[in-house]
From Swiss-Prot:
GO CC terms: cytosol
UniProt family annotation: Belongs to the DNA mismatch repair MutS family.
InterPro entries, sorted: DNA_mismatch_repair_MutS, DNA_mismatch_repair_MutS-lik_N, DNA_mismatch_repair_MutS/MSH, DNA_mismatch_repair_MutS_C, DNA_mismatch_repair_MutS_clamp, DNA_mismatch_repair_MutS_core, DNA_mismatch_repair_MutS_N, DNA_mismatch_repair_MutS_sf
Keyword tags: ATP-binding, DNA damage, DNA repair, DNA-binding, Nucleotide-binding
Naturally occurring in which organism (per UniProt): Anaeromyxobacter sp. (strain Fw109-5)
GO-annotated molecular function: ATP binding; ATP-dependent DNA damage sensor activity; damaged DNA binding; mismatched DNA binding
PANTHER family associated with the record: DNA MISMATCH REPAIR PROTEIN MSH1, MITOCHONDRIAL, DNA MISMATCH REPAIR PROTEIN MUTS FAMILY MEMBER
Record protein name field: DNA mismatch repair protein MutS
Residues reported to bind ATP: G626, P627, N628, M629, A630, G631, K632, S633
A Pfam family assignment: MutS_I
SUPFAM superfamilies for this protein: DNA repair protein MutS, domain I (SSF55271), DNA repair protein MutS, domain II (SSF53150), DNA repair protein MutS, domain III (SSF48334), P-loop containing nucleoside triphosphate hydrolases (SSF52540)
Entry keyword ATP-binding: yes
Domain of life (superkingdom): Bacteria
Protein purpose: This protein is involved in the repair of mismatches in DNA. It is possible that it carries out the mismatch recognition step. This protein has a weak ATPase activity.
């Protein structure tokens, strides 16, 4: 804490406040600015690129910087992006009422505690992740404070905890103080977001504190009983929310079980490789699967769709329920358009509710909420007549708020100002008390004119005037010549040179009314606003239920729109261990290609787990070979995406699809290093492969692309072969294994469930045409030099590459043109003395004499030669060599 020899009362107030929030940048309200001092000023001026000045007091020079209060939201948003916390210290009384204005921290804004709609992405959840630690296990809570969504549960180890936190995309992490510090730091580093430490008290008595907050006798009805670590994390999440926002989070009115058991598991590598929410190139939304699918009308619908994409299902009933709803809407274009029209007026009720309940909302939020609630009856009517149960349930969930909607509509002005002090947030006619005050405030001049006219007529004093000054307020001025006509009810206030000043009881009442009308208007409007806010808070559970129903209906509409517009089919999802995709397409790649012959080439993927009845026909492990750029990775990714889409309850890009439930999808596709953690490309590849081998089950879908390419050829082939064997022999799951190691095709000779597939090419002269079609069989070439030519490598480099390739191909030793690895096969080895170095000079031209002798030798019938003839031939050949 900085020390100042003689701090002013204001600076003493600042230092006391800062001491309570040492880990936050303190925005301290001074008039029209938020000021920062000392280290906070140095940090903020650098982060925000604003001017750093100094506040001088004697020998003390205090570094300071500031931002206008009306522009603070933008500056706070920039600080949050850089991982800072910001404590907002506001003036909580009017200046002049005391020697120093009273100030309090009204809220602490952190990366996981954001409510400002100008900072939040409307289509992204904003999760705080809270971790509770115990020996061998971890409790997790995910809290989206902006919507009131709270989930909790337990996971078996820290690795799973990290994966769940990253899958949710948490913005901030809360870890316990006093726990295993090294363990907590490992989790913090692995998750990679700003973290806060909270005292053990936040985690204690969790069951009791949650029951009291939710107003229930037992948590069993929420399905979260029996997992004390999860409850501890949930209690800590609520404590952090209440502490940072300085309010009771009444909008968090329920808690649900963290979905770790009945959802398809997707590790971070798989989510990244499949580009579900961000592209590999640049990390952009555009070009991701979510960007393609999100045809939702509302922000909650977009968030719900993202949630479904992150957590595909593994239970058949809810999958089929979603598919039923999507099928109904996909087949009814008029119904889709009607539903979209009904959803458009529905604002983001979840986030509006959160701001209002926490005391951060304004009249515009109330007006937006009123508009959203007014739109619900039409939506309920539209959904209530649908056949699909999910659509009917969504319609039912939007009912019951008609009275509140009408009340808010009557109360709140059509276009209210942003702040109470501007006045005019309440409609005329809602409050007689307020209407009277407003009428007086707005009709003050008219009242004065009417009063003056009445008094002139009553007294007969034509020169009588009603005047005002700051000392006496309103008064009646009468000249000396007319003092004899002054009525008895006039009360003398002041004698002047030219006459006297009087007041009347009516003028006193008017003065009191007019002079305080604006303050009274603000006070009454503030009271009415608070009453409306409380009424909204009391209806929070019903509003959240309706918002949830809107989100579900909108997400289903989005999936139906995509299905209808892109020609997707309803997948057959069952309990088998089969994946059959007929004419499947990659949804994102297809969308960017033109239609017709130059468009996307569909492919079939037919694979089953070992032990499944269909395995003998389809195979369990497909070794896919073929040229670079031929489309191997695309085919494998689209198989994974079709599986994922089917299990999230969406239609799929295929002519026909059957998807047996998958418990996990693993992908090892592409190459990248992790320099920050000291891991090479090959180390990253091996780490991800190890995770697959340790965690895959027979129900998993595994997609592997070019395992082993990051090391030497022999090491790479050996690793790839061993990995494929393990997946076939030990795991037996559905596996797509793309490789340029053609030796792996020999697996099919000794493994019954291995199938060889290749992507077809056609050679036209010296040109290679990639047909993008997956066919039975193996590839003998990778056409890497042809791809290098397409990439624009210099001609001399390509020519030299062809020479080297010929040298290498000349050393191939078996009938397949490559080393044979299958057990029991006989191989021939090249003479090591004759092997050429990979980059050895090209061999010298052959000797013409040797060529002539070799030709003669090949033409000679040795069995017909007499010994003398043979000796003569040898002598002649020796002479040629000389």
């Amino acid at each position: 804490m900085p020390e100042i020899a003689q701090p002013t009362p204001m600076m003493r107030q600042y230092l006391e406040t800062k001491a309570r929030y040492p880990d936050a940048l303190l925005f301290f309200r001074l008039g029209d600015f938020y000021e920062l001092f000392f280290e906070d000023a140095l940090t903020a001026s650098e982060a925000l690129q604003i001017t750093l000045t100094a506040r001088a007091k004697g020998d003390d020079k205090v570094p300071m910087c500031g931002v206008p209060h009306h522009a603070a939201r933008g500056y706070v948003a920039r600080l949050l992006e850089k991982g800072f916390k910001v404590a907002i210290c506001d003036q909580v009384e009017e200046p002049g009422k005391s020697a120093i204005v009273k100030r309090e921290v009204t809220r602490v804004v952190t990366p996981g505690m954001v409510f400002d709609d100008q900072v939040l992405d409307p289509r992204e959840a904003s999760y705080l992740g809270v971790v509770a630690l115990a020996e061998g296990r971890a409790g997790l809570a995910l809290l989206d404070a902006s919507t009131g969504q709270l989930q909790c549960g337990e996971v078996p180890d820290d690795a799973r905890a990290v994966d769940e936190l990253r899958r949710a995309g948490v913005r901030e992490l809360v870890l316990p103080l006093g726990a295993d510090a090294a363990r907590a730091e490992r989790i913090e580093r692995a998750v990679g977001v700003p973290a806060a430490r909270r005292p053990a008290a936040d985690y204690e008595r969790a069951d009791d504190r949650l029951r009291r907050h939710l107003g229930v006798a037992s948590l069993d009805g929420f399905g979260v009983g029996g997992e004390p670590l999860g409850l501890a994390a949930a209690a800590a999440a609520l404590a952090y929310l209440a502490d940072t926002q300085r309010a009771t989070p009444r909008h968090v009115d329920r808690v649900s079980r963290l979905r770790t058991e009945d959802v398809l598991l997707l590790d971070e590598a798989t989510r990244t490789n499949l580009e579900l929410e961000r592209t590999l190139n640049g990390g952009r939304k555009k070009g991701s699967l979510l960007a393609l699918l999100d045809r939702s009308v509302t922000a909650p619908g977009g968030r719900r769709l993202a949630e479904w994409l992150r957590y595909p299902l593994t239970e058949l009933a809810p999958i089929h329920a979603r598919l039923d709803a999507v099928e109904e809407l996909a087949g009814a274009s008029v119904a889709r358009e009607d539903l979209a029209a009904a959803l458009r007026p529905v604002a983001d009720a979840e986030r509006l509710l959160s701001r209002l309940v926490l005391g951060q909302g304004n009249a515009r939020d109330l007006r937006a909420l009123a508009g959203a609630l007014l739109a619900l009856p039409a939506l309920a009517e539209l959904l209530g007549g649908r056949a699909a149960a999910l659509l009917r349930d969504a319609g039912e969930g939007t009912r019951g708020l008609e009275e509140l909607a009408a009340h808010l509509d009557r109360a709140v002005a059509e276009e209210p100002p942003a702040t109470l002090r501007e006045g005019g947030i309440i409609r005329r006619g809602f409050s007689p008390e307020l209407d009277e005050i407003v009428a007086v405030a707005e009709d003050g001049k008219g009242f004065i004119a009417r009063l003056e006219a009445r008094e002139k007529e009553r007294t007969g004093i034509g020169s009588l005037k009603v005047r005002f000054n700051k000392v006496f307020g309103y008064y009646l001025e009468v000249t000396k010549a007319n003092l004899h006509a002054v009525p008895s009810d006039y009360e003398r206030r002041q004698t002047t040179v030219g006459g006297e000043r009087f007041v009347t009881p009516e003028l006193k009442r008017f003065e009191e009314t007019v002079l305080t009308a604006e303050e009274r208007r603000i006070a009454v409007e503030g009271r009415l606003f608070e009453e409306l806010r409380q009424r909204v808070a009391e209806a929070a559970p019903r509003i959240r239920t309706a918002a949830d129903a809107v989100a579900t209906a909108d997400a289903l509409l989005a999936l139906a729109r995509v299905a209808a517009e892109r020609g997707y089919c309803r997948p057959e999802v069952d309990g088998s261990e089969v994946l059959e995709i007929v004419d499947g397409r990659h949804p994102v790649v297809e969308a960017v290609l033109p239609e017709g012959p130059a468009g996307f080439v569909p492919n079939d993927v037919l694979v089953a787990s070992r032990g499944a009845l269909e395995c003998e026909r389809l195979g369990a492990l497909h070794v896919i070979t073929g040229p670079n750029m031929a489309g191997k990775s695309t085919v494998m990714r689209q198989a994974a995406l079709v599986t994922l889409l089917a299990q999230m309850g969406a239609f799929v890009p295929a002519r026909k699809a059957r998807v047996g439930i998958v418990d996990r999808i693993f992908t090892r596709v592409g190459a990248s290093d992790d320099l920050a953690r000291g891991r090479s490309t090959f180390m990253v590849e091996m780490t991800e492969t190890a995770a697959i081998l340790h965690n895959a089950t027979r129900r998993s879908l595994v997609v592997l692309d070019e395992i082993g390419r990051g090391t030497s050829t022999f090491d790479g082939v050996s690793i790839a072969w061993a990995v494929a064997e393990h997946l076939h022999d030990q795991v037996g799951c559905r596996t797509l294994f793309a490789t340029h190691y053609h030796e792996l095709q020999d697996l099919a000779r000794e493994r019954p469930a291995v199938r060889n597939l290749t992507v077809a090419v056609r050679e036209v002269g010296d040109r290679v045409v990639f047909l993008r079609k997956l066919v039975q069989g193996g590839a003998s070439r990778s056409y890497g030099i042809e791809v290098a030519k397409l990439a624009g490598l210099p001609a001399e480099v390509l020519a030299r590459a062809r020479e080297i390739l010929k040298n290498l191909e000349a050393l191939e030793v078996d009938e397949g043109g490559h080393a044979a690895l299958a057990r029991g096969r006989k191989t021939r080895r090249a003479d090591p003395q004759s092997q050429l170095g990979l980059f050895a000079p090209a061999p010298a031209p052959a000797d013409p004499a040797l060529e002539e002798i070799a030709s003669a030798l090949r033409a000679t019938e040795i069995d017909a030669l007499r010994p003398l003839d043979a000796l003569n031939l040898l002598a002649a050949w020796r002479a040629k060599l000389r």
